[in-house]
Amino acid sequence: MLSRIEQELAQLGITNVKEIVRNPSYEQLFEEEMKPELEGFEKGRLTTSGAVAVDTGIFTGRSPKDKYIVYDETSKDNVWWTSDAVKNDNKPMNQATWQSLKELVTHQLSNKRLFVVDAFCGANKDSRVAVRIVTEVAWQAHFVKNMFVRPSEEELLNFVPDFVVMNGSKVTNPNWKEQGLNSENFVAFNLTEKIQLIGGTWYGGEMKKGLFSLMNYWLPLKGIASMHCSANVGAKGDVAVFFGLSGTGKTTLSTDPKRKLIGDDEHGWDDDGVFNYEGGCYAKTINLSEENEPDIYRAIRRDALLENVVVREDGSVDFADGSKTENTRVSYPIHHIDNIVEPVSKAGHAKKVIFLTADAFGVLPPVSKLTPEQTKYYFLSGFTAKLAGTERGITEPTPTFSACFGAAFLSLHPTKYAEVLVKRMEEAGSQAYLVNTGWNGSGKRISIKDTRGIIDAILDGSIEKAETKELPIFNLAIPTALPNVDPAILDPRDTYADKAQWQTKAEDLAGRFVKNFEKYTTNDEGKALVAAGPKL
C-alpha cells in the first residue's frame, strides 16, 4: 500500500522518503508529539487536561499578505483578484515563481520521515474533496486529523486525493524580493495542479483555511452556497446558521446544550440542506472558562491540540494569559462535543440565518430583523470590529468590512456568494437577523447571557411575536422586549447617558458603511441595494 503513496509523492517531486506514517492514530500522534528529542516548534507539551500544547512561533494567526494564487487559464476568469480599487488577499503568482516554491517545498520534504494524512473536506459524499496533507511535523498531522473529516478504513483503501497540501513550514523562500513577493513566507495555491504550498509559517490554521478557500472556489460554481458560519439544529429539525468573523461568537453561540451542533466554522448549503466541511472545531481559548463555555472547556482533553497558550509550571493552562497572542486556539475532533449531529455532520435547510457582528463603536442594536434587501446589504458589508490578535499586528479593536463575513477566504466575487445564499434562503423561506455581540453605550461588552437570550428568542420564534420599532439612520427593525433579555439594552440609544452621543457615533459608522459599499455599486444590482443601507 505504501509503495503506491510513495509513487504518488514522487510524482509531486517528494523523493527518497525514509518512512511514511499514514493516517496515524491519536495514540501514535501523542507518542510522536511527546518525543523528548523534539526541538523548537515541533515540541509538544502535555497539559493537566490531557491535551497537548504547541507553539507556532511568530505566526500566531494567518498571514494573508503572503497568500497567492497561480494566475493561469483555470483561475484567470473565475478568481476575485485583488486590484488597486478593491484590495483583497487573492494576489496573482506566475508559473515560474510557483515552480520555484514547489521545488523548495518538495526538496524540504524529500529524504525525510513524513506524515501523510488522507481526509475529506465536506460531509456530503457528492460534493466533498479528498485531500492529502503531507508534513514532517507530528502535531500538524494531529491538527488536520482533528479538523478534517476522518475516512473509514474502507475509504482509505481506494483513496485518491483531489487536492494535496504540502506543508513545508521549516523552509523559507530566499528569492522573494526578486520574485516581487511580500516576504520569505508563502501560502500559495495552484488550481490547475490542485496543490497548496506552505512555507515559513507554522500556524495550523493555514491548512484549514486553505481548504476553505478552495471549497469557496469550487462549490458556488456548482450553485452550492459556501459559508463562513457555524450551524446547529433543534429537536424539531430546525436549522440555524451563524455567520460572523473571528471573535464574534460563532463557536460559542452555536455550541448550545439545547441544540445539536452541525459545525462551528465552515459549511455548504445544497439541495439537501446544510453540511459541515470539517470533522473538528477550532475554538478561540482566550479567557475561556468552564462557567461561560462549558462544552468547549470540556472538549479540551486528550486528543485536543492547544496552540500558543501559556502553560504553567505544573502543566495547567492559564487561559487568561494572552502574552503570546490574543488568538490562542484549540482544535479538537467534533465528537469531543456531546451534542452533535451524528453520524454525518449535516441537516436540513436553514430557516434562521444569523449575522454576528461585534460592534466596537457601540452603535448597532443587539438584535434586529432584516428585510431581504437588508440581508444582502449586511451580508456584502460583513461588518465587525476586528478583535485582538486573529491576524498578525492587530491588537486594538478596529472597524472592518469583510464581504460575506469572510472576505479573506472568498475565491470568487462576493456578489456570487450573496446570490447563491439568498437563492437558498428564498427557496427555504428563511429569515435573517443582525446580532451585535459587541459593545454599547455602557462601554461594556453585551453580556453572553443577554446574547444567548436573544439567540433563544430567534430560535424559538418568540422574536416574531415581539413588537418592533425602527432605529433611525440604520432603519433597522428592533424588538422592544424579549424574554430573558435586559430590555434596557435593546435600543442602543438607551445605553448612553446622552443620546446625542449615540447619534454622533451612528453618523460616523453609517458613513463608513456607505463608503465601503461604494465598491458594489458598479452594477445595477449593487446600486439597488444602497437604499437598504444606512441613510445619512
UniProtKB/Swiss-Prot annotation:
Keywords: ATP-binding, Cytoplasm, Decarboxylase, Gluconeogenesis, Lyase, Manganese, Metal-binding, Nucleotide-binding. ATP binds at residues 209, 228, 244-252, 293, 329, 445-446, 451. GO terms for molecular function: ATP binding; metal ion binding; phosphoenolpyruvate carboxykinase (ATP) activity. Substrate binds at R62, Y203, K209, R329. Its cofactor is Mn(2+). The keyword Zinc-finger does not apply. Pathway: Carbohydrate biosynthesis; gluconeogenesis. One of its GO terms (cellular component) is cytosol. It is found in: Cytoplasm. Belongs to the phosphoenolpyruvate carboxykinase (ATP) family. HAMAP family: PEPCK_ATP. This is Phosphoenolpyruvate carboxykinase (ATP). It comes from Actinobacillus pleuropneumoniae serotype 7 (strain AP76).
